[in-house]
């Protein structure tokens, strides 16, 4: 007697472990679409809640954050007079090194604040140690490496091999590691320096978004890195001055910042 194989007919079940042979009514497709829609709505709600919490928290602690940033920026400024007495490195060499750092910063797609922090670490190290001309670029690479590790995404941090290649193999691998360690020890592991970009973000958060003003202010701040006269200028003052100049260049009206600008002399800023 020949046996007949009966095709099983499972009913609809909302599980990933049971499959039916047919979906003539499109039930599964509708359920999957509904799940994706629910996930998308949940993500939007989460982002909205996070933005509100971030805004409320920033408003609550803004003054405390600014106070801490001002203390830190004063404690982590380089001494231009100490750099002046360097025997081998001269001021005309600094723009060439900054060109190199800016190129490396762009090549590795690092955050804007990483560049400002790297230059701060470089100048602070040169304020405390005698730097030979042949090691000047090495100090710059070590400063960029430390700054990237401190505030950038892990996958963007340059490797020693990449830095060595950019330096045309002028330094051995272990020299980068040794210089990185020496910079950290010299600065007593105090890396956190409030950069111009940090103060720019705070100032811009108090006004309507304007990408052109932000980009222009950042560009002005980057250009100021090349001039030694701006080395002693506090990042907070530089940020406000860059914003004021950017608005003037772009023909934007000057904005009054009641909470933040009141801390500074308007004559210094403008």
Predicted regions located by residue number:
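Short, mixed-charge aromatic SLiMs
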Residues: 164-177, 208-209, 261-270
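Acidic, Ser/Thr/Pro-rich regulatory low-complexity segments at or just upstream of the first helical elements
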Residues: 1-138, 145-202, 215-223, 249
């Amino acid at each position: 007697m020949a046996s007949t194989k009966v095709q099983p007919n499972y009913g609809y079940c909302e599980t990933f472990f049971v499959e039916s042979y047919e979906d003539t009514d499109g039930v599964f497709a509708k359920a999957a679409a509904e799940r994706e829609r629910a996930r998308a709505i949940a993500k939007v709600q989460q982002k909205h809640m996070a933005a509100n919490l971030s805004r409320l928290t920033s408003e609550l602690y803004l003054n405390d954050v600014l106070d801490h940033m001002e203390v830190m920026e004063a404690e982590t400024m380089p001494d231009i007079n100490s750099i002046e007495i360097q025997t081998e490195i001269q001021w005309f060499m600094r723009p060439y090194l900054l060109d190199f750092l800016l190129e490396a910063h762009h090549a590795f797609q690092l955050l804007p604040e990483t560049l400002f922090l790297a230059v701060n670490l470089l100048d602070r190290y040169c304020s405390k140690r005698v730097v030979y001309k042949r090691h000047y670029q090495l100090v710059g690479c070590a400063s960029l490496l430390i700054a990237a590790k401190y505030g950038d995404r892990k996958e963007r941090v340059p490797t020693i091999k990449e830095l060595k290649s950019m330096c045309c193999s002028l330094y051995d691998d272990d020299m980068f590691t040794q210089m990185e360690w020496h910079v950290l020890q010299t600065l007593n592991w105090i890396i956190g320096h409030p950069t111009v970009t940090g103060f720019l973000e705070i100032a811009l958060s108090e006004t309507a978004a304007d990408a052109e003003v932000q980009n222009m202010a950042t560009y002005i701040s980057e250009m100021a890195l090349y001039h030694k006269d701006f080395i002693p200028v506090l990042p907070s003052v530089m940020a406000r001055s860059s914003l004021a100049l950017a608005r003037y260049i772009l023909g934007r009206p000057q904005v009054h910042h009641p909470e933040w600008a009141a801390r500074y002399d308007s004559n210094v800023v403008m």
